[in-house]
A protein has these predicted regions:
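AAA+ P-loop NTPase catalytic core and its hallmark functional loops
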Residues: 1-168
Length: 168
């Protein structure tokens, strides 16, 4: 990954999340799955103040935990979130590699931290990502596997698989 974050783009069922999880496994890093949806906000990503024992303290969100602990953060369906929520990730994903938490210390990304965005094209609720965000990723377009290649893969992986199941 050479220090880069990835954006895996393509149609549904092309293995984007499977690839992201396998990359984390190959590198031996923990994974934080971050579901991006239309109403996700900065607090859901970075964290927010909470009351514990009469004291206000910061409760980390999945992005800040991943950043601090050197994990792989999978930003699932990143093109469903609004720009306002995604803007908090700009300094995280660019050369600064920091998260600014208002009222708290800056969180510097662990050297091993990587973020992998996934997105589908052209489905209800999705939209184009702005250029500023896309420029912070290496974009990989995931191809759709042909029926013929899927059958070959299934037969190679499961030699005893009956033809009727491979043909479905």
């Amino acid at each position: 990954l050479c220090g880069e974050h990835l954006l895996l783009a393509g149609h549904k069922a092309t293995g984007k999340n499977v690839l992201a999880e396998n990359l984390a496994a190959v590198f031996g890093r923990p994974v934080w799955d971050v579901s991006m949806y239309v109403n996700v906000d900065a607090a859901a990503l970075i964290g927010a103040d909470t009351l514990r024992g009469g004291q206000v303290e910061f409760r980390e969100g999945p992005v800040s935990k991943c950043a601090r602990l050197g994990g792989f953060g999978v930003l699932d369906e990143v093109n469903m979130a609004k720009n306002e929520a995604l803007a908090v990730l700009h300094a995280t994903l660019d050369h600064r590699r920091v998260i600014d938490v208002p009222g708290y210390e800056r969180i510097h990304l662990d050297e091993a931290t990587r973020f992998i965005g996934t997105m589908n094209y052209g489905y209800a609720g999705t939209r184009e990502l702005n250029e500023a965000l896309v420029s912070r990723f290496v974009v990989l377009d995931m191809p759709v596997i042909s029926d013929e290649n899927l059958k070959k893969l299934l037969r190679r992986s499961f030699p005893t698989l009956k033809d009727q199941w491979a043909e479905q």
